[in-house]
């Protein structure tokens, strides 16, 4: 089969069989079977995900990463290859990322067989990008200890940019992503005896108001930050004073100092609830993803490789507010660079955003991704 047939076949198979973070067992088996067919050795440091390696002629070792997990979303696309898993969908394009890396593996194996693979290559089929921090898990598990990796590259499909456009930015390109949760515990009573209870309803209302004011009163208005409330609940019945409350959301920022400010303000909010409402209140933070930092030292190589892949380069003036665990590779492993590849095509109806039930794209864009990867490999220079 030709390369377009290859990416269409594999991407649509993966799209039909999405799996959630840390449960990508069939996806992992599919990748392993593909690598086995090429007689490529690989490791599985975690229960899911695969690390493959090919030795080249040069002394440098570079890595390419694709995330393999999906999202808990019910697909609404009316296509023959729609998800066969109820309420699970590749709504972030990771099926495309995985497919592009598979094709790149095949190209590299062909080059190796011909004695023409210029450098050593590590292929990272990473689990749990959406939740679970798969990149960090792999690093902590020692998955890369035996590889002297000098640079890590990755891409993400981007339905906000047209086909043929690659979006880049030095330094911060995505935000940190930190989840927070407030837990409230009061005392229930009948609504007719409201004074006998300690209401988590009014207390939660106070928390909502105070959180919504953090961005306005405590953060620099010239910086792009998000303090988002995603879900909240108090009580179980309409005629009782609620004895419990719950609120959760996410914080997006590029500045660690701003994140510290938000956390400190949330701790103060929790303390104020105890004083004002006689309700116990605790705030907890889940381990988040740091901002993705693109190494300026890799910029020239990235731009040249994209142009040679017939992609028009757009230098984004401000970072995205997405969270992305590719950030851990640049933070802990080696200089890294993350590129967004445009997939928007209004004529074909490929216009909906990431994490939506109608996300779709033309597989031909994946050929450009692989050309970009190969150009990087063929012209890699140590930084």
Curated annotation (Swiss-Prot):
InterPro entries: Amidohydrolase, Bact_exopeptidase_dim_dom, Peptidase_M20, Peptidase_M20_dimer. It is an enzyme of class 3 (hydrolase). Its EC number is 3.-.-.-. One of its GO terms (molecular function) is hydrolase activity. Gene3D superfamilies: 3.30.70.360, Zn peptidases. It comes from the Bacteria. Keywords: Hydrolase. The keyword Nucleotidyltransferase does not apply. Belongs to the peptidase M20 family. This is Uncharacterized hydrolase SAOUHSC_01399. It comes from Staphylococcus aureus (strain NCTC 8325 / PS 47). The lineage of its organism: Bacteria, Bacillati, Bacillota, Bacilli, Bacillales.
């Amino acid at each position: 089969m030709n390369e377009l047939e290859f990416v269409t076949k594999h991407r649509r198979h993966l799209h039909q069989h999405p799996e959630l973070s840390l449960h990508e067992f069939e996806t992992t088996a599919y990748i392993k079977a593909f690598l086995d067919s090429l007689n490529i050795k690989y490791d599985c440091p975690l229960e899911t995900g695969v690390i493959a390696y090919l030795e080249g002629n040069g002394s440098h070792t570079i890595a390419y990463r694709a995330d393999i997990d999906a999202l808990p979303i019910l697909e609404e696309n009316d296509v023959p290859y729609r998800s066969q898993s109820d309420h699970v969908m590749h709504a972030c394009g990771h099926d495309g990322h995985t497919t592009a890396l598979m094709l790149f593996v095949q190209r590299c194996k062909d080059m190796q067989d011909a004695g023409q693979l210029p450098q050593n290559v590590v292929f990272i089929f990473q689990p749990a990008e959406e939740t679970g921090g798969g990149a960090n898990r792999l690093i902590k598990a020692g998955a890369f200890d035996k590889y002297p990796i000098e640079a890590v590259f990755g891409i993400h499909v981007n339905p906000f940019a047209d086909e043929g456009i690659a979006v880049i930015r030095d330094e911060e390109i995505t935000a940190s992503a930190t989840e927070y949760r407030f837990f409230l515990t009061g005392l229930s009573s009948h609504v007719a005896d409201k004074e006998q209870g300690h209401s988590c309803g009014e207390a939660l209302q106070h928390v909502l108001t105070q959180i919504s004011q953090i961005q306005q009163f405590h953060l620099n208005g010239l910086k792009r930050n998000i303090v988002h409330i995603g879900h909240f609940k108090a009580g179980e019945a309409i005629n009782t004073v609620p004895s419990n409350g719950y609120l959760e959301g996410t914080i997006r920022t590029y500045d660690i100092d701003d994140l510290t400010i938000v956390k400190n303000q949330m701790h103060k909010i929790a303390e104020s609830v105890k004083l004002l409402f006689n309700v116990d209140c605790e705030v907890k933070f889940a381990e988040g993803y740091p901002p993705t930092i693109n190494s300026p030292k890799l910029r020239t190589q990235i731009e040249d490789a994209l142009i040679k892949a017939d992609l028009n380069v757009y230098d984004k003036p401000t970072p995205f507010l997405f969270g992305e665990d590719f950030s851990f590779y640049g933070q802990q492993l080696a200089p890294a660079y993350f590129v967004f590849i445009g997939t928007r095509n209004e004529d074909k109806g490929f216009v909906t955003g990431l994490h939506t039930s109608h996300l779709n794209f033309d597989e031909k864009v994946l050929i450009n991704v692989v050309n970009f990867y190969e150009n990087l490999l063929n012209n890699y220079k140590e930084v």
